[in-house]
Amino acid sequence: MRKISLISIAMLIVSIPTFAGGLLTNTNQHPAFLRMLSRGANTTSVDAALSNPAGLAFLPKDGFYTSLSIQSAFQTRNIDASCEALGLDKYYEGKASAPVIPSVFAAYKKGDWTISGFFGITGGGGKASFDDGLSMFDAMVIGGLLQQGIPGKAYTLNSYMDGKQYIYSVQLGLTYKITDWLSAFAGGRMNYFTGGYKGALNASAAVDLPMPTGGAIPVGTELIGIDLDCSQTGWGFTPVIGLDAKFGKLTIGAKYEFKANLNIENNTKVNSLRMIGAPESELEDYKHGVNTPNDIPAMLSVAAAYEFLPVLRASVEYHFYDDKNVGMAGGKQKFLTKGTNEYLDRKSTRLNSSH
């Protein structure tokens, strides 16, 4: 019984990244995205340095182009969990926040050549806090203690978890205008991952509990305890290539980002797993110095835009993320059947040149 409970707790902690945001791609890197979701065929503004870098060859005139934007994102993640068999009926409230999401774009165009750069947060889920723990905490612990004959009303359970994940990226590249209608881009992006988890769990006896070997477990005795304080860092490189073609009022942009091999390394200050009757141990995945694969998947972007009028434009865009062929913690990619498909479409009215 004790072995099963220990495994349950370990599984519980491993699943926490899902609630901290996981390895997500942040598509929105510029306020213009809120007006037009499909940016992959953009050739008129500097944010194309990320969404359609080959299209920078068709910027209106030679010279420097720069853009700095700061956005904020806040979200509540609430869970209403109940399980009659486990005696679980509780409402959990979590708060996720990314108060500062900076993006910097720059490009210099001279004739047929354009050099461009970008800095921003391209992945991660920001910060998430669950002050009353997670339903998984309670369910796993309740299940483990029930297997040892300890009913839910016989103990009190307290837990909390804070998590954060960010991927900071710097991209540089060169665009060349091959013909009057075709251009190409080649460059690369350096990605730096920083994140971590800090939390605690304590299940203690609420009444005197009988021991199988005789005697009793006094009120207040810790039955299960977890303390974790682990920060994680890592880096990886993403090669990027792109093409852009203009056929009158029709623009087609394509970009391919190769897979970035990224391993994150633990810098663990606290890692304690305790269960009554067993020696103190550690959570294997969060031991100091352990490396975990968290690759950034290859991504294909294809977009088309058509300008009906000088003030009216329609665009569509397709993204494919090859999640199946990357390295993930615990080999999670083996359970995927395919990658992720994303579709964006939008009609846009350009009100003035200040956008």
Walk through the language-model features, giving the residues of each:
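N-terminal, post-signal peptide beta-strand-biased segments of exported outer-membrane/organellar beta-barrel
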Residues: 16-124
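Residues that define the transmembrane beta-barrel architecture of outer-membrane proteins
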Residues: 47, 97-102, 166-170, 233-239, ...
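Outer-membrane beta-barrel channels and translocator barrels
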Residues: 61, 110-113, 179-181, 247-250, ...
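Transmembrane beta-barrel strands of outer-membrane/channel proteins
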Residues: 66-74, 117-121, 186-190, 254-258, ...
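Solvent-exposed loop segments that connect transmembrane elements
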Residues: 84-86, 131-158, 194-230, 264-289, ...
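Membrane-embedded beta-strands of outer-membrane beta-barrel proteins
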Residues: 104, 172, 241-243, 252, ...
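Residue-level signature of outer-membrane beta-barrel architecture
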Residues: 107-110, 176, 190, 241-247, ...
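Conserved small/polar residues in nucleotide/adenosyl-binding loops
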Residues: 345-355
